[in-house]
Amino acid sequence: MLSSTAMYSAPGRDLGMEPHRAAGPLQLRFSPYVFNGGTILAIAGEDFAIVASDTRLSEGFSIHTRDSPKCYKLTDKTVIGCSGFHGDCLTLTKIIEARLKMYKHSNNKAMTTGAIAAMLSTILYSRRFFPYYVYNIIGGLDEEGKGAVYSFDPVGSYQRDSFKAGGSASAMLQPLLDNQVGFKNMQNVEHVPLSLDRAMRLVKDVFISAAERDVYTGDALRICIVTKEGIREETVSLRKD
C-alpha cells in the first residue's frame, strides 16, 4: 500500500505548499430553518385593501398540505400575509394576536393598521440575532379609511407601499404589479385609480400565472378583501400539480 507521500507526490509538486487537513474538533451544525414555500400579495386601493396567498404548504418536492392559507385576520380592518418557514409564521402570528388582545383590554379599542405595522417592526427587530424566517406583508385600512400596505424585511425595516408581493413567486409577481398597478417606467399612460373589480381580476390572473411556473405555489388562492364593511374572503382554485 502506498504511503500518502507517494500517492500525492508528482514531478514539479512541492508538498510543503499543498493544503493539509488537520484534525480538529467535531462541529455540529444547527439548521432550524426550512422553507415551506408559498406566495403572498397585497394591493391597496382608494378605499380597500386586498391580501392574497396560495394554500400550498410544501418542503422540497413534497407537499405537506394543500389547504394552508397564509393570510391571517388580525382586526376588522387589518390582515397579515406570512410566507416562509411555517413554524415561524404560526409563532409570529400568535405573538401578534396576543399583543392585540392586550392592547384592546388596556385601551378599549382595536389597534390601527399603522400601529400594528410599527409593533411588528419592533417584534422582528427584537429577534434580529435569531430572526423569524418569514416574509411579512400587512394590508388594511388606515385611520382615514384608505387602503394601506406595509412590507417588511426579516429584521424589522418596513415601509408603506401601494402593492407588494412576497414569497417563492415574488420575483414573477412583483414586475407584473409594477407594470399593471404602479405603471413604473411607462410613458403616455394615464394613471387611473385602481378599482376593486380590476384589482381582483389582476390578483387572480397573476396567481394563475405564478402557479404555472413556480412549483411551491398552487392548489388554491385565498383572497381577503378589506373594506369599511369588514373583511370578506374568496377562494379560487389553482393547478394542483
Swiss-Prot record:
Protein's name according to its UniProt entry: Proteasome subunit beta type-1
Gene3D superfamilies reported in the protein's UniProt record: Glutamine Phosphoribosylpyrophosphate, subunit 1, domain 1
Predominant cellular place of this UniProt entry's protein: cytoplasm
Organism: Homo sapiens (Human)
Matching PROSITE patterns: PROTEASOME_BETA_1 (PS00854), PROTEASOME_BETA_2 (PS51476)
Function statement: Non-catalytic component of the 20S core proteasome complex involved in the proteolytic degradation of most intracellular proteins. This complex plays numerous essential roles within the cell by associating with different regulatory particles. Associated with two 19S regulatory particles, forms the 26S proteasome and thus participates in the ATP-dependent degradation of ubiquitinated proteins.
Subunit structure: The 26S proteasome consists of a 20S proteasome core and two 19S regulatory subunits. The 20S proteasome core is a barrel-shaped complex made of 28 subunits that are arranged in four stacked rings. The two outer rings are each formed by seven alpha subunits, and the two inner rings are formed by seven beta subunits. The proteolytic activity is exerted by three beta-subunits PSMB5, PSMB6 and PSMB7. Interacts with SERPINB2. Interacts with RFPL4A. (Microbial infection) Interacts with HIV-1 protein Tat.
Outcome of substituting residue 103 to H: In NEDMHAL; uncertain significance; results in impaired proteasome assembly
Residue ranges of the propeptide: 1-28
Subcellular location: Cytoplasm; Nucleus
Positions of glycan attachment: 58, 209
N-acetylmethionine sites (modified residues): 1
One term under GO cellular component: cytoplasm
